[in-house]
Amino acid sequence: MNILKISLAVLTIGSILSADSIDDKFQSLVGKSLFIGNSSNLHSGHYEYGKEGGNQPELSDSGITIPYYFGDKGDLWRPFVMGGIGYSKMEEENSNLRDTGDDIELTSLYYKIGGGLTYNPTCDFSFVVGGSALVMNTDGDYTTKTPLTTSEGDQKIKKLFDSETTNSIYDGYGGFVYKPTIYGYKSELKSNLHYLKMNFDNGIDDVDGIYLDVMAKVRSNELTTIFCQPVWIEHYVKGDFVNSKLADVIGFNSAVSVGSTLHWRVGPLIPIIKDSRLRDLNVALNVQKTISNRDFEGWKAGVGFSLVKF
């Protein structure tokens, strides 16, 4: 009888620990997707978490955020709004949730809205405050060689990883932008301090924290012209620094990204926008590599559009 009581107690403790680990896994995988989708430095890339050959989640993200500034460039105060949409896929093979080598796939579509205010005391220096909200709708697919049972742990796995969930991240930030010309080269220094809060579905604990992003960029002079429009290149270094509370969810304390963007001005070639605010539209080719202090690394490469005046 005593042996039976002890066995039942062990099973009860085991199920509680399993439920906690399932919550942590959901918080970690979805939290990574939320952070990357929200990050101006890291979104639209492919990233790996963990060592080769081990439990190694992989995330692919693709999105676009478009800001709109009211007023004119020389105005002292300029409010702005932004809107964006994106898609991400988080995959983890041979998950350690169960001992059966199961696979997790979380496919998400997200929407982002926000706005803020810039203060421009000089032509090359600005302060900014703003905020945004990103809502992510996630469709989970849990693949297992051993069917899920009616146990509490397995049913929680089904609820979180084999169903649809809605999660979100809220971002309040303030920072500055400085655009000096150094030895004839246009440069840019930028930094923002963020307060982030992640909200998770199904009663999973929220996570909040502070993080700092920085960027240093230098622009070349005109390299050549195509159809009489300038082509130039930018080289940059970006950094993301996260407090420990947030780092445990997103998988790193500090990350550094190095990249280049090739721009070709096309706005004047398009009749319907050549005399509008979109006249500075460029086709942009970007390549970036990211490393971190933990087992987080990634890259991104793609063709898009930019609104940068040459």
Residue ranges and their predicted role:
Residues 1-20:
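Classical Sec-dependent N-terminal signal peptides that target proteins to the secretory pathway
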Residues 9-14, 115-116, 175, 224:
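Small side chains
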Residues 19-99:
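Short glycine/proline- and aromatic-enriched beta-strand/turn motifs that initiate or cap beta-hairpins
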Residues 25, 72, 76-218, 237-243, ...:
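Outer-membrane pore/translocation modules
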Residues 29-37, 76-84, 126-130, 186-190, ...:
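Residue-level detector of the transmembrane beta-barrel scaffold of outer-membrane proteins
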Residues 55-57, 66-75, 105-107, 118, ...:
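Subset of outer-membrane beta-barrel
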Residues 201-310:
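Outer membrane beta-barrel transmembrane domains
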